[in-house]
Amino acid sequence: AAQALGRALVSAKWLSEAVRAGRVGAGLRVLDASWYPPEERDARQEFKERHIPGASFFNIEECRDKSSPYDFMLPSEAHFADYVGRLGVSNDTHVVVYDGDELGTFYAPRAWWMFRAFGHREVSVLNGGFKNWVKEGHPVTAEPSQPAEAVFKAKLDKTLLKTFEQAMENVGSKKFQVVDSRPAGRFQGTELDQGLESGHIPGAVNMPFSTFLTESGHEKSIEEIQQMFREKKVDLSKPLTATCRKGVTACHIALAAYLCGKPDVAVYDGSWSEWFHRAPPQYKVTELK
């Protein structure tokens, strides 16, 4: 079981050996899941210019529920299956996801969690991300890859997903612990969250996602992560749901807990962007006076 759980992260060394050995193909697919605010960086353009050999671009803007008023909500089973099938991913493919964020990893855990939410277990995040891949001198290319289409069957695992109604009910029942991965100022309500007044769900504990990464942008050790959860009095033997602003960085909490042997962390997909619009005022905790 430890080995199976350990696959949630792969090292740049492991992946570069797989690339050099020509293993990228039907059995191993590499996906760049980068997303940046459009005014800052163009993820697709950067991918075209430079990516891991054999990688495809996993577009989080495309692979989502476009009918939702909230950003980046989980797509339907059929949409996800069709989308990843076109990237050459079948149910037997080992998928490795990465992104090019300067932190090391930002959006990749969201893609990792999406695959898991749709029943795919063989999925890993590249530890250290593209930033460290380049820094360590591993190969990059501008060559587009043309993966042969594959058939992917998606089955949503509802235990990994929480809705607004479940999160509301939990404020009273406290059936599950809630960890919020946003920066402290947004959690406390002292700084604006991209135009939204900020704050948090009553009872939530704050563990900013960047605190799970080392200065170099790698995931902290399992011992360090376990200590972080202990310090916040989060019990990994009990139900846990992660939240953030739009369901992206919450997936860092799911990944961190997974590395500690807890694979069942749910993500509240709507997160603060939905909570802000739908929850009654007394359900929005803020330190702003």
Swiss-Prot record:
It is an enzyme of class 2 (transferase). Pfam families: Rhodanese (PF00581). Expressed in numerous tissues. Residues 143-158 are annotated as: Hinge. InterPro entries: Rhodanese-like_dom, Rhodanese-like_dom_sf, Thiosulphate_STrfase_CS, TST/MPST-like. The keyword Mitochondrion applies. Keywords: Mitochondrion, Repeat, RNA-binding, Transferase. GO terms for cellular component: mitochondrial matrix; mitochondrion. Residues 24-142, 172-284 form the Rhodanese domain. Substrate binds at R186, K246. Its EC number is 2.8.1.1. It catalyses: thiosulfate + hydrogen cyanide = thiocyanate + sulfite + 2 H(+). The keyword Mitochondrion applies. The active site is at C244. It is found in: Mitochondrion matrix. GO terms for biological process: rRNA import into mitochondrion; rRNA transport. GO terms for molecular function: 3-mercaptopyruvate sulfurtransferase activity; 5S rRNA binding; thiosulfate-cyanide sulfurtransferase activity. It comes from the Eukaryota. Monomer. Contains two rhodanese domains with different primary structures but with near identical secondary structure conformations suggesting a common evolutionary origin. Only the C-terminal rhodanese domain contains the catalytic cysteine residue. Together with MRPL18, acts as a mitochondrial import factor for the cytosolic 5S rRNA. Only the nascent unfolded cytoplasmic form is able to bind to the 5S rRNA. Formation of iron-sulfur complexes and cyanide detoxification. This is Thiosulfate sulfurtransferase.
